[in-house]
């Protein structure tokens, strides 16, 4: 069994980690960063961009840049009307399945396909770091994700070419990281406010046992919503000042979104942030600029309703765990949005103690996922994780009522059965409608699927005994079986189509991803070669400038000739030319370096530096 990685697939940023030498390690991506933006874009040429490089070009390519996709995964269009208004790309409704339109390619993507591109990049970065192909992962999801969203996340992993060994709740993963070395028993509350989702979990932690007592949350609340409040404020202010509605301009909206996120981050440490967006719009009179100062007090006023929404899940989790705030030993903050001072103050106010900020809120979830990956891979011993199902599961019964079979906060894996009967005489079959949620009426809960049990023996109503069994695995994914006790006939359903993607569609996406893997890798390598060549040109110019007084004219001319050719190759995307000329330029600069630093290198007894030494050295003038 190869290395199993832990992945935090976030709304705004994602992180991958692995167990090394018994300790979890966050893996740096190919750009040298520990977090990777969950952004995927396609250029006008059809090139795929993932991560920071995709985020950087979002302003000039908003219609083909996909972010915050986690808000759509496993959902139907009717469930995400608010989120649809917050993104500049087009979201299509096809048979109530969410599809993201990509004009650059002239095709549509499922949310799972976009998320798969992020997962594939994380897996590729992990492969480079470890020196072995990564094929297995533990992926985290918000604790309050329903069955559809969990299954959709597994589908995304499959499309990315990963075997998802376990889906684990984000707050639970955070607790694994926090409590890994804790010996004393503690009751902790994990407050996880990320880019797009919010969870609260209460756990008993100590001596290798992690037991979730209760979980609550809101999958429609996160940092994106705080950004949106600032965007709306800027739009309204600009409309009042200039009479121009910026919501009609996708590029302007993208610039506003990026400026809002920057201001939000600054207001975590400063009391005021200046927002300056020149040329945000153009009129016949000339260009218009947006200049506004946003104070922390105004920001908190704009977001007061969002901060208030953080209260209820805390109160619900305490109630379900049958605990008072004073029973909580530590409250651990997770997710980038917990850096907002008003959020920290709210948690302190509700629980009566300062939050524990000993963990990195951006990385702690991936680190915990790596610990769980280590458990599954046999690297980590003496860890017992007892997680729970976040929402009640049941069936629809007579009168459109939801009858709960597995209450929320039931420890998983679990298997529970209830016996039902028929509603009319000689009823030949029953339809089992599986539901998830806390509402009394079936129509108000999430429908996970239906199936029919045929061949019930004729009998008066109320006589047949139909046993319905709910089986929830360690990933929180459900299977339901109905059995007629008289005839032993049974029918079952695994709620696996809940991601809204048919099995053959998932298989098609997997196949398509595999077919494109080679070309995607080739394009990635081309970009890498181009970036290195571009960097080499810059460094060479800089070194020529610094060494100009020490260089012979012929040597300088020789280097500049190759440099000009390499710059032209970069301009023309000439891959082979870039490779050959880069090698030639490095060789020439090495020779120059030898002459400058060891002028007697060729003389008797002189020792020339090795080629490796020459490449690794930064040329600089001695002062």
Swiss-Prot record:
Keywords: ATP-binding, Chaperone, Chloroplast, Nucleotide-binding, Plastid
Source domain of life: Eukaryota
Bridged cysteine pairs (disulfide): none
InterPro entries registered for this protein in UniProt: ATPase_NBD, Chaperone_DnaK, Heat_shock_70_CS, HSP70_C_sf, HSP70_peptide-bd_sf, Hsp_70_fam
Gene Ontology cellular-component terms listed: chloroplast
SUPFAM superfamilies, alphabetized: Actin-like ATPase domain, Heat shock protein 70kD (HSP70), C-terminal subdomain, Heat shock protein 70kD (HSP70), peptide-binding domain
A GO molecular-function annotation: ATP-dependent protein folding chaperone
Chain's role: Acts as a chaperone.
Family membership noted in the UniProt record: Belongs to the heat shock protein 70 family.
The protein, known as: Chaperone protein dnaK
